[in-house]
């Protein structure tokens, strides 16, 4: 791993509550659409999901471009141009189900769920990337102590599941390599400092060989955190499931041909 994100995208969402207002004005329900506007959302799947044009690190650089697009349930994604070689994340365009520094949760998502409920969250994703520079392809899963998370609710924990990466490395320290859900993962544990004096735990599972397709049961990972390592209480709530690309710099496009999240 060559680079570590020292200014993660999560801090942006805690520090700028004014963004909430702009998000309300830039949400679209689509059959087929695209947008290059900062923080735009394209809703689909009966509003269960949305594509989010998250460009939280844009102030670090000029001349950037990023566009999200949705054509159909088997044709969606985003492209980007971030002319930078610094070791900080510039953007996290993503697919979102549930909460994301918002007032509540997406419709029909089944979220939030308390870990003690023993429900399973399964997710499937298939994608291809053509890109240069530094980036990853990763799930981002957020936890709170409440089932009523709002736009100003700071999370207590974050679970990242890296399916692929190029020249990028997770925050925190390497702990061990584990086998979960038919795959091998390098486990990292760290802490995200927020400028408001708070912060949260971040747990990253990095696929040891990389994959462009995954069928995950999120409980495999939360059981490891709660039961095996006792790093997290089962009283916490899973608030959201995202999949996106943390982009440090470069040019590229991701095409997603399968995406779903189900709570059972």
Swiss-Prot record:
GO BP: cellulose catabolic process
Catalytic activity annotation: Endohydrolysis of (1->4)-beta-D-glucosidic linkages in cellulose, lichenin and cereal beta-D-glucans
Name of the gene: celS
Coiled coil: none
Alphabetical UniProt keywords: Carbohydrate metabolism, Cellulose degradation, Glycosidase, Hydrolase, Polysaccharide degradation, Signal
A Pfam family it matches: Glyco_hydro_12
Signal peptide: 1-32
InterPro entries, alphabetized: ConA-like_dom_sf, GH11/12, GH12
Protein name: Endoglucanase S
A GO molecular function held by the record: cellulase activity
Annotated SUPFAM superfamilies: Concanavalin A-like lectins/glucanases (SSF49899)
Species per Swiss-Prot/TrEMBL record: Pectobacterium parmentieri
EC number, as in UniProt: 3.2.1.4
Annotated family: Belongs to the glycosyl hydrolase 12 (cellulase H) family.
């Amino acid at each position: 791993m060559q680079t570590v994100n020292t200014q993660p995208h999560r801090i942006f969402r805690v520090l700028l509550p004014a963004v909430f207002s702009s998000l309300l004005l830039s949400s679209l329900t689509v059959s087929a659409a695209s947008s290059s506007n900062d923080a735009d959302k394209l809703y689909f799947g009966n509003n269960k999901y949305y594509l989010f044009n998250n460009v939280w690190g844009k102030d670090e650089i000029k001349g950037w471009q990023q566009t999200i697009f949705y054509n159909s349930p088997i044709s969606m994604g985003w492209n980007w141009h971030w002319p930078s070689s610094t070791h900080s994340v510039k953007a996290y365009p993503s697919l979102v189900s549930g909460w994301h520094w918002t007032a509540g949760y997406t419709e029909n998502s089944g979220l939030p769920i308390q870990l003690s409920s023993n429900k399973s969250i399964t997710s499937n994703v298939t994608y291809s990337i053509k890109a240069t520079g530094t980036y990853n392809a990763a799930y981002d899963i957020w936890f709170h102590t409440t089932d009523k998370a709002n736009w100003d609710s700071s999370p207590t924990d974050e679970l990242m599941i890296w399916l692929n990466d190029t020249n990028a490395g997770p925050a925190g320290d390497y702990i061990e390599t584990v086998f979960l859900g038919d795959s091998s993962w390098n486990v990292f544990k760290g802490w995200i400092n927020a400028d408001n004096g708070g912060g949260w735990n971040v747990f990253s599972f990095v696929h040891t060989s990389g994959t462009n397709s995954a069928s995950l049961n999120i409980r495999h990972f939360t059981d490891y955190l709660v039961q095996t390592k006792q790093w997290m209480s089962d009283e916490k709530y899973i608030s959201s499931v995202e999949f996106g690309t943390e982009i440090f710099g470069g040019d590229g496009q991701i095409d997603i041909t399968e995406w779903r999240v189900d709570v059972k």
